[in-house]
Amino acid sequence: MAVFRSGLLVLTTPLASLAPRLASILTSAARLVNHTLYVHLQPGMSLEGPAQPQSSPVQATFEVLDFITHLYAGADVHRHLDVRILLTNIRTKSTFLPPLPTSVQNLAHPPEVVLTDFQTLDGSQYNPVKQQLVRYATSCYSCCPRLASVLLYSDYGIGEVPVEPLDVPLPSTIRPASPVAGSPKQPVRGYYRGAVGGTFDRLHNAHKVLLSVACILAQEQLVVGVADKDLLKSKLLPELLQPYTERVEHLSEFLVDIKPSLTFDVIPLLDPYGPAGSDPSLEFLVVSEETYRGGMAINRFRLENDLEELALYQIQLLKDLRHTENEEDKVSSSSFRQRMLGNLLRPPYERPELPTCLYVIGLTGISGSGKSSIAQRLKGLGAFVIDSDHLGHRAYAPGGPAYQPVVEAFGTDILHKDGIINRKVLGSRVFGNKKQLKILTDIMWPIIAKLAREEMDRAVAEGKRVCVIDAAVLLEAGWQNLVHEVWTAVIPETEAVRRIVERDGLSEAAAQSRLQSQMSGQQLVEQSHVVLSTLWEPHITQRQVEKAWALLQKRIPKTHQALD
């Protein structure tokens, strides 16, 4: 059957009966849709009979909220799918509810196919039912012309995937601080204005649960705080975080898709309290298990400032059924960023001027990042490694190409008695002096680049197809012109300082000063094709490097494999 880029799944079975079938329905839908899957809940609706079915309100109960949570949890095993549960017809217990929309709702990705769990008695793709389904879908949402329709049956499944059924006792996935949630059928209260906050990096299904609950509770406006600047410093692999504007763009599209009747105020979150700590018009705050204490702190802060407490709604974390050894066991952006390590982040450079049978990697990183250990791991996998520090030593040596120009520029007092350049004395001359440093680098960098080209020729002569240039100043020196890809090793600055102090015997202040004189990890990553990290145990670093190497072999053009 054809695969569609976007689809709409209309669920008509009562939620309690739907639970045992949820996994197979999602699996079937994932076979037919390869990008965006919208989900519309209309329990109890029939697609048989002459009357055209109409969208009707669904009471927001704790059972509905739990179902939304478990649907997103079940969808997490289908990582190619961007699932979005539409909330326009899900209504809280409130006296100020706006009427259901009378016009169709526009969607960011108009569905190309409409799917349903509704089943005919004979288990066929009965045309009148499919026609009713298409009419219903197009009366509610903007869909593509010539909308296809499919009734999902068990024979569409490709095997069950783990998902918690709803017909077994489970703790509520959302619980207000007061009152405590009662039965699953208990209606959920609505509020005028509320808030939710987070980093929202690479919007995932746990984010979607948090945001969906907040959207259901809010009837007029939702304030969404998006962490930025200082609040990002403690994040794992912050260099791989999406830029603030990109996170806001994806977040805003999702919010408008699922509940366009709300007014969304998406703002940067620059401190732990944000507007939730000071806005008197806010009534509720949605938090996760991890941020519940932060919500309590916000309420204490509000009381200290003569503001009413917010109603806190706590969401359970979603379990990540596919997490690996060094990843969190919950669905998290941190794990997503870890999985990016070793992947190609942007297209390689085209370098027709380089040897056609050699593919060149430029490996860089801040001091203490472990890039040289990564270079040795790549060497063990078959790469030819060029150490730019070693080339610098060769260039400085008496008779080397940089020796005479450096002595002429800085004087003979930088020499040892035996005529060798005293690099410590030379370093003291240029450190902190931009003019003197530029004089030195203008001499050294072109010479090292020339020596690197000679080493690349040697790699070709030895029959190597991959060459790695290990260089801390790769980008500052402009040596990216010598490579097809830039690979960067990243490490938290605190860990880099610890390693420098331990390795080089420097004080913490001296180590920090060294790092401040270099390009930051963030600046390096912005120009990198592949990112690696030595933050974890050595065998995890090895696994990363092997992954990066294996992916590299798949994308190296055949011309670079000619000597194999």
Swiss-Prot record:
Pathway participation: Cofactor biosynthesis; coenzyme A biosynthesis; CoA from (R)-pantothenate: step 4/5; Cofactor biosynthesis; coenzyme A biosynthesis; CoA from (R)-pantothenate: step 5/5
Enzyme class, spelled out: transferase
Tissue and organ expression note: Expressed in all tissues examined including brain, heart, skeletal muscle, colon, thymus, spleen, kidney, liver, small intestine, placenta, lung and peripheral blood leukocyte. Lowest expression in peripheral blood leukocytes and highest in kidney and liver. Isoform 2 is expressed mainly in the brain.
HAMAP family per the UniProt record, alphabetical: Dephospho_CoA_kinase
Pfam families assigned to the protein according to its UniProt record, in alphabetical order: CoaE, CTP_transf_like
Subunit structure: Monomer.
Illness association: Neurodegeneration with brain iron accumulation 6: A neurodegenerative disorder associated with iron accumulation in the brain, primarily in the basal ganglia. It is characterized by progressive motor and cognitive dysfunction beginning in childhood or young adulthood. Patients show extrapyramidal motor signs, such as spasticity, dystonia, and parkinsonism. Pontocerebellar hypoplasia 12: A form of pontocerebellar hypoplasia, a disorder characterized by structural defects of the pons and cerebellum, evident upon brain imaging. PCH12 is an autosomal recessive form characterized by onset in utero and death in infancy. Brain imaging shows microcephaly, cerebellar hypoplasia, micrognathia, and multiple contractures.
Alphabetized CDD domains for the sequence: DPCK (cd02022), PPAT_CoAS (cd02164)
Protein EC: 2.7.7.3, 2.7.1.24
Organism per entry: Homo sapiens
Record-linked SUPFAM superfamilies: Nucleotidylyl transferase (SSF52374), P-loop containing nucleoside triphosphate hydrolases (SSF52540)
GO biological process, one term: coenzyme A biosynthetic process
Protein's recorded name: Bifunctional coenzyme A synthase
Domain DPCK: 360-563
Residue list for modification Phosphoserine: 178, 183
Cellular component, GO annotation: extracellular exosome; mitochondrial matrix; mitochondrial outer membrane; mitochondrion
Keywords, ordered alphabetically: ATP-binding, Coenzyme A biosynthesis, Cytoplasm, Disease variant, Kinase, Mitochondrion, Multifunctional enzyme, Neurodegeneration, Nucleotide-binding, Nucleotidyltransferase, Phosphoprotein, Transferase
Gene field: COASY
Described function: Bifunctional enzyme that catalyzes the fourth and fifth sequential steps of CoA biosynthetic pathway. The fourth reaction is catalyzed by the phosphopantetheine adenylyltransferase, coded by the coaD domain; the fifth reaction is catalyzed by the dephospho-CoA kinase, coded by the coaE domain. May act as a point of CoA biosynthesis regulation.
Compartments, record wording: Cytoplasm; Mitochondrion matrix
Coiled coil in keyword set: no
